[in-house]
Amino acid sequence: MKKDRFLIGILVFIAVLVVAAVALFFVRGEEQAYGPEDTPDGVLKNYALAIQNMDYERAYTYLAERDGKPTFETFQQSFLTRQLDTSNSTLQIGEVYESGTNSAWAEVSVIYAGTGLFDTGWSSNDRAILVRQDGAWKITYLPYPYWGWEWYTPTPMPVKP
């Protein structure tokens, strides 16, 4: 009889944990909203969120107008064909440093999800580079998988013998 009460107590405790986990899942399941675009970190957050939401038109607007900018079709295809695959990663934005009034860089970490039960994943630290164009912050560099290696890369000139 005493063992039955103990077992029932354990089962009730487990049931309460399951109900709490399901409730938290549905409460926190709301969609993230875009933030302000007047700061470098706001632009980086909105770019990453647009990529996550597959809103490639919006994400493309955050790219700087410079030589080597990919066409919209190239940009979109990079994500649709999974050349750039952000499905198992997230972008964490750290400190932002403005140098002057027209350029900034931010410390960023790309955090990759683990692939197994005991694999906690890994992260890669890098930086994002932004410039101010026509009063708006635009991105000129982000680490892979949020950026194509060939974007904004100058075309090499052939060496004359």
What are these regions (language model features)?
Residues 2-53:
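Short, low-complexity N-terminal intrinsically disordered segments enriched in polar/charged residues
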Residues 1-2, 101:
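Generic cytosolic/nucleocytoplasmic N-terminal low-complexity/intrinsically disordered segments
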Residues 2-4, 71, 142:
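Alpha-helix initiation/capping motif
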Residues 42, 46, 56-107, 111-112, ...:
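Short solvent-exposed beta->alpha transition segments
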Residues 99-161:
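Exposed beta-sheet edge and beta->alpha loop/turn motif
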